[in-house]
Amino acid sequence: MLRQRFVFDTTALTDSQAWESEGCTTLCEGMSAILHRVAQARLHLGISCYVPYPSVYNEIRDFVRNNNCDIAILGKIDTWLVKKTPDRYRVKIPSKIFYEYVDYMRSRINKGMNVSEEAIWEAVSRCLSISATGEGREQMREEIEREVVGSIIRKFREKYRAALRYGILDSAPDIDVLLLAKDLDAAVVSQDLGIQRWAEQLGLRFMEARAFPQMVREYMSFVPLHTEELEDRMV
């Protein structure tokens, strides 16, 4: 079997669909189960799974701590995930990709600006309709804060995220995942739409987080190992 390499982003371990496919009901159980699959892939299939260090590695460790997971999971992370810093000076990205990214970001920023303008106009219109009723100033202020400002801000946040965040690379760890995969000629494992989009632009193999455990299970079903062989491979 051709030796394969995969680069994980944080969602490769934290995506609910990935660990629910393993029959888990909590994030901590799910991360442990997926790391078990990573161990199987390493020992029996010659598959190596990497995480960019320190960016993604620290994000994953923070997830473990913030969700009060068993400290043993930290040990599994250090044991089975290969930590590597991408060579940001050696990896070359075609100028066409850079041009397309800037153009794409400009269009998303314009969408975000349109969402902002819509929210402002809606707020003004609703405030005018309330003031037209002739209520007392204090009562009007409370009603505006309660009925107008709060609801518009919630709606604005949802639309702004959709316009500006989904499908883009919005953090250094996202970029590190792509650079490391490019450096290693590895596949990317993620549930992030931005990483997926730009992995495809860079010609990188991409696998959704939920598909990785299924892939390992499928491989393992065709690798019948006797007890002696298992022990030998674990030495």
UniProtKB/Swiss-Prot annotation:
GO molecular function: ribonuclease P activity
Enzyme class: hydrolase
CDD domains: PIN_VapC-like
Reactions accelerated catalytically: Endonucleolytic cleavage of RNA, removing 5'-extranucleotides from tRNA precursor
Xref: InterPro entries: RNA_free_RNase_P
Gene Ontology process terms (BP): tRNA 5'-leader removal
A Pfam family recorded for this sequence: PIN_5
Annotated function: RNA-free RNase P that catalyzes the removal of the 5'-leader sequence from pre-tRNA to produce the mature 5'-terminus.
Entry protein name: RNA-free ribonuclease P
Organism of derivation: Methanothrix thermoacetophila (strain DSM 6194 / JCM 14653 / NBRC 101360 / PT)
